[in-house]
C-alpha cells in the first residue's frame, strides 16, 4: 500500500494530470457561479473562496501534508498592500469572467504576460528576447482574432454588445492589476523569503476581512437579492461550486509544487502553456460560447503563443545559468 502511494506521489504524469484538472475545475466552477441568473455578489464569492482556502490549507497542515509559517503581525502589516492588490485582481478577474466566455478570458489573460515581462525589464533589469517578442505578437494577434469572433456573434444585440465591451473593460483592468500584483509581490517575497504556502496563507487570510467588508458595504444583502443570487432550484449547486472553486485554488498551488518536484521547472512551464488549450476548450464544452472559425482559431493561436513563450523562457534560463561559467 505504502509503495503504491509513494509511486503515485512521485509520478510525473499523475502530477501533470492533477495540475490540469485543478486548473480547469477552478475556471469552470467560477464561470458556473458567475454566469448564473443575475449573480451580482462577486465579493461574497471571493470571500467564500478565501475562507475555504484557509480552512483547507489549515487542515492539510494539521495532517502534516504541507507547512507554512505561523501568523506574525509585523509580517501581516508588511504584506497587507499585496492583499489589497490581490483583492483588486481577483475581483476584476471575476467581473471579466462574468461577462466574457472562458476561451476569450483565457486568451486575453495572456496579455498580462506582456505587461509582467516589460515590468521586469523596468524594475528588475530583465530582458525580452526575440522569441519572447514573437510570442507577444502572437498573443496580441490571438486576442484580436478572439475579439473579432465575439464581435461577429454579439453584433446583433445591443445588450450583448454592451456586456461584451464591459467584459473587455474588466479584462483590461485585470491585466494591469495582475501585473502590478505579481511584480510587487515578487519584490516583497525577496524581502520576506516567503515560500509558496506562506504566500497563499497571508494572501487569503488578509483578503478575507477586505472582501467581507466590501460585500457588506457595496453588495445588496436583502432577502430579495439573495433569492436572485441563490435561486431555490440550484442553490445547493451554486454554494457547492463556490466551495469547490476555493478548494481547487489550493489544488492548483499544491499540484504546481508537486509537478515541479517530480518533473522539472522546464516541464512545468511547458504544461502551463499547454494547459491553456483544455481550459479554453472546456469553456466551449460546458458553457454557451461563440463557436465559429475565429473563436476556435484564436484558441489555437493563443495556445501557440503560450508554447513559444515557454520555450523562450527556457532558453533564457539556460543562458542565465551558463553565464557565470563563461566568464
UniProtKB/Swiss-Prot annotation:
SUPFAM superfamilies: Multidrug resistance efflux transporter EmrE. Its main location: Golgi. Homooligomer. Keywords: Cytoplasmic vesicle, Endoplasmic reticulum, Glycoprotein, Golgi apparatus, Membrane, Sugar transport, Transmembrane, Transmembrane helix, Transport. This is GDP-mannose transporter. Residues 1-4, 58-78, 126-131, 185-207, 260-266, 313-327 are cytoplasmic. The lineage of its organism: Eukaryota, Fungi, Dikarya, Ascomycota, Saccharomycotina. It is a multi-pass membrane protein. GO terms for cellular component: cytoplasmic vesicle membrane; endoplasmic reticulum membrane; Golgi membrane. Belongs to the TPT transporter family. SLC35D subfamily. It comes from Scheffersomyces stipitis (strain ATCC 58785 / CBS 6054 / NBRC 10063 / NRRL Y-11545) (Yeast). The chain crosses the membrane at residues 5-25, 37-57, 79-93, 103-125, 132-149, 164-184, 208-228, 239-259, 267-289, 293-312. Glycans are attached at residues 158, 234.
Amino acid at each position: 500500500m505504502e509503495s503504491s502511494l509513494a509511486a503515485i506521489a512521485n509520478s510525473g504524469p499523475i502530477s501533470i494530470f492533477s495540475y490540469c484538472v485543478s486548473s480547469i475545475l477552478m475556471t469552470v466552477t467560477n464561470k458556473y457561479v458567475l454566469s448564473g441568473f443575475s449573480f451580482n455578489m462577486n465579493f461574497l464569492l471571493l470571500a467564500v473562496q478565501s475562507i475555504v482556502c484557509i480552512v483547507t490549507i489549515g487542515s492539510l497542515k494539521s495532517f502534516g501534508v504541507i507547512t507554512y509559517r505561523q501568523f506574525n503581525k509585523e509580517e501581516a502589516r508588511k504584506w497587507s498592500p499585496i492583499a489589497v492588490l490581490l483583492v483588486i485582481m481577483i475581483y476584476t478577474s471575476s467581473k471579466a469572467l462574468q461577462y466574457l466566455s472562458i476561451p476569450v478570458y483565457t486568451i486575453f489573460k495572456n496579455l498580462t504576460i506582456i505587461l509582467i515581462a516589460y515590468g521586469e525589464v523596468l524594475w528588475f533589469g530583465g530582458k525580452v528576447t526575440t522569441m519572447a517578442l514573437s510570442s507577444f505578437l502572437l498573443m496580441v494577434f490571438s486576442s484580436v482574432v478572439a475579439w473579432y469572433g465575439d464581435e461577429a456573434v454579439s453584433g446583433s444585440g445591443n445588450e450583448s454588445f454592451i456586456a461584451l465591451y464591459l467584459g473587455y473593460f474588466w479584462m483590461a483592468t485585470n491585466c494591469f492589476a495582475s501585473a502590478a500584483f505579481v511584480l510587487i509581490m515578487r519584490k516583497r517575497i525577496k524581502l520576506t523569503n516567503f515560500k509558496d504556502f506562506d504566500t497563499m496563507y497571508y494572501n487569503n487570510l488578509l483578503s478575507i476581512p477586505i472582501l467581507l467588508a466590501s460585500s457588506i458595504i457595496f453588495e445588496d444583502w436583502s432577502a430579495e437579492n439573495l433569492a436572485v443570487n441563490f435561486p431555490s432550484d440550484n442553490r445547493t449547486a451554486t454554494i457547492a461550486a463556490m466551495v469547490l472553486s476555493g478548494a481547487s485554488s489550493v489544488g492548483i498551488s499544491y499540484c504546481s509544487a508537486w509537478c515541479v518536484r517530480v518533473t522539472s521547472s522546464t516541464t512545468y512551464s511547458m504544461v502551463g502553456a499547454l494547459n491553456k488549450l483544455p481550459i479554453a476548450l472546456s469553456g466551449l464544452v460546458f458553457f454557451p460560447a461563440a463557436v465559429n472559425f475565429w473563436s476556435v482559431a484564436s484558441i489555437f493561436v493563443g495556445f501557440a503563443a503560450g508554447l513559444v513563450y515557454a520555450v523562450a523562457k527556457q532558453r533564457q534560463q539556460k543562458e542565465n545559468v551558463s553565464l557565470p561559467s563563461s566568464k
